[in-house]
Amino acid sequence: MVKYVLASAPAKVILFGEHSVVYGKPAIASAIELRTYVRAQFNDSGNIKIEAHDIKTPGLIVSFSEDKIYFETDYGKAAEVLSYVRYAIELALEESDKRVGIDVSITSQIPVGAGLGSSAAVAVATIGAVSRLLGLELSKEEIAKLGHKVELLVQGASSGIDPTVSAVGGFLYYKQGKFEPLPFMELPIVVGYTGSTGSTKELVAMVRKRYEEMPELVEPILEAMGKLVDKAKEIILSKLDEEEKLTKLGELMNINHGLLDALGVSTKKLGELVYAARTAGAIGAKLTGAGGGGCMYALAPGRQREVATAIKIAGGIPMITRVSREGLRIEEVSR
């Protein structure tokens, strides 16, 4: 019998195409090597207990049974963390048709609310750990679908990009609900976190308002973004050498950031981090995600440390990382 399972799932960045994807245009996303780790084991109480560490809700401990929830510690984000994890556990239990007590412990390298897919990563890692504990052998694609279901249950709407990238890993081209894996490329990147977050809902609504008020100006921007994503896909699929690919992708990143800025979703701080990264030698830098705060990322072959230092000096929180070939990973199974 399995004693416990430790699973991990990565964060993601939208490489190209945020906001325009809402209007039916494509996007390219990738998993990055910042991970959430979930350990699952059985308990004798028949209840489910969740402990979360290092995810901006330090020391959070929550227990719940069929009809009661026990907040053993009082933190504002408790319900937010609980909702993704609880639904993930519930869906895994439904798949196994079992009702048992489970302890889940979570640690994470991914900042919450930064636009890096922390919610999807914790859902995917939880489903991965709990399903394996219960003896299920779900494919990554099946786990991605369950992760998407968790997001729909919690958020009411979801494209499925975040849980799919987190479960499957690598590069994914997304358009109108369909995913296409792209060949893997090593991207030496630095993520810069502003320390603040923007509301995706509000930012999407703001772009929608501008689109409705000035379609003749906004539509060409969105159209250019869509063409840019397809150009990036063309470069990734091309037979150019790696250095040429990186240079061209960096150029597209800079253009994409300018288009996002034109839509009004960048901020002074994001701009400062983007330009600090470029000045320090990044060949491309742009915001990633909804904007209004959150994160930017820089492509910095051979210059990651220098770019990270520049981001820190500019007031950001740098994270040196790389694209993750793997998505969900079962780290350990103890019997």
UniProtKB/Swiss-Prot annotation:
One of its GO terms (molecular function) is magnesium ion binding. Its main location: cytoplasm. ATP binds at residues 111-121. It is found in: Cytoplasm. The keyword Transport does not apply. Pathway: Isoprenoid biosynthesis; isopentenyl diphosphate biosynthesis via mevalonate pathway; isopentenyl diphosphate from (R)-mevalonate: step 1/3. It is an enzyme of class 2 (transferase). GO terms for biological process: isopentenyl diphosphate biosynthetic process, mevalonate pathway. The keyword Secreted does not apply. One of its GO terms (cellular component) is cytosol. Keywords: ATP-binding, Cytoplasm, Isoprene biosynthesis, Kinase, Lipid biosynthesis, Lipid metabolism, Magnesium, Nucleotide-binding, Transferase. It catalyses: (R)-mevalonate + ATP = (R)-5-phosphomevalonate + ADP + H(+). NCBIfam families: mevalon_kin, PRK03926.1. PANTHER family: MEVALONATE KINASE. Belongs to the GHMP kinase family. Mevalonate kinase subfamily. This is Mevalonate kinase. It comes from Pyrococcus horikoshii (strain ATCC 700860 / DSM 12428 / JCM 9974 / NBRC 100139 / OT-3). The lineage of its organism: Archaea, Methanobacteriati, Methanobacteriota, Thermococci, Thermococcales.
